């Protein structure tokens, strides 16, 4: 599957960086206030009168393509539509047939379930940064039935993570990932306002995970050959927007993103929301901020990565089932969720890891968009029985 020319292309294109015009909303819709730009592209700009001149066209009702919008819910503000009913009402976007009349997940040639399973096996084999049995030791303890997951009973007297080798977490992708985890307010309703340093940390993580690993380059090569992206620059920028672009989960505040929800975790309505990452679990458990109660699922894998569904409290806030891939590298987690979201947005995505099936459930954020009507990631997680 690897193509030498593609790797050369990747290096060349990455050097172009993430370039945006300072006075345009192209590729910036919904992103948090950034003083490095001369104008802004989120809902707050309407209140503060500092929107870019193309804000309405780019961010509100200007979507004229179905790329990234297949099967989206009807929105009367959109100029054209990309769901199964648009043909009946004669209001499909002009590229609906080319992009959505297949199960391709967003453009180019059809991406079949077999394609996804095949590339997930390749990514699994390429995860050279995953934990080994000597670098990570877990202590699952109490296994509960699905009917008991809401009981909020602490059935495990010891932490889940018995030992994690510190040198594992100092590797470049782990270090870059940890740097981003510290940048969020966990309570929904609190505005996320990033400093230039924090924005730089987001880009560093994407670079380390996707451009500086063979695993990340393989994911791009797959999506490139399927026609989903025309260049690595487009791929990296889209990852940045779908994962780090901000939207509002509560009270019209720009308080959330796919990355925060899935990897860092949030508190909403008095309970834990999201939180599907083993590294965040470990660091909070080590600090005494997280109390592991039990698990309701432990996957069939006998080496890392494994998959678990866990019950726990985070500073007193309960999570009934927090599923996560355990012991994988940050780039593997990021790549699997990205693969599934890009190819199966809002659906179940069937992967194969070492010959064993893993189902990832993805959800799209349907209230706001970025770019030409593309949707942010709302959630993605292992679907455990």
Swiss-Prot record:
Protein name per the record: Uridylate-specific endoribonuclease
Listed InterPro entries: ENDOU (IPR039787), EndoU-like (IPR037227), EndoU_C (IPR018998), SMB_chordata (IPR020436), Somatomedin_B-like_dom_sf (IPR036024), Somatomedin_B_dom (IPR001212)
Record has Iron-sulfur as a keyword: no
Catalytic-site annotation from UniProt: 261, 276, 319
Cofactor dependence: Mn(2+)
Keywords: Disulfide bond, Endonuclease, Hydrolase, Lyase, Manganese, Metal-binding, Nuclease, Repeat, RNA-binding, Secreted, Signal
Record-linked CDD domains: XendoU
Family: Belongs to the ENDOU family.
Record field: catalytic activity: ribonucleotidyl-uridine-RNA = a 5'-end dephospho-uridine-RNA + a 3'-end 2',3'-cyclophospho-ribonucleotide-RNA
Primary role: Endoribonuclease that cleaves single-stranded RNAs at 5' of uridylates and releases a product with a 2',3'-cyclic phosphate at the 3'-end. The UU and GU sites are more efficiently cleaved than CU and AU sites.
Name of the gene encoding the protein in the UniProt record: endou
